[in-house]
Amino acid sequence: MNYNEILLNNLRLCNRFSFVIRDFNNISSMEKDILDMFSHFLILDRECSSWPGTRLYKKTAHVFLYKYTQTAYEILESLGGDLTDWIHPYRPEELCFYHNEQPIFVSITHECDFYYVE
């Protein structure tokens, strides 16, 4: 599946999505723009050391959880590219999709690892 197919498939399966900014003190202007684009959909911004597919040791990152709606889908789609483009400094990292609290699609961008949870 390509990026757009994954986004569309997840729109049917999921109602939330998240991404990660590992170093909030070193956020790029592109990442700031993306945070602004999704500000109306924000459910939660938390600093933590783990999220689906990743566990940090001795560090934390900001995980942003959003409502996944038709409009959010359209914004993600308009950003174009591929899942591998979701990496600092161009975009936040590790785009994941959930049904309520349950991860459905997980990406570990820096390892080029993407999968649906069974």
Predicted regions and their residues:
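Structured alpha/beta or helical-core interaction and ligand-binding surfaces enriched in interleaved
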Residues: 1-118
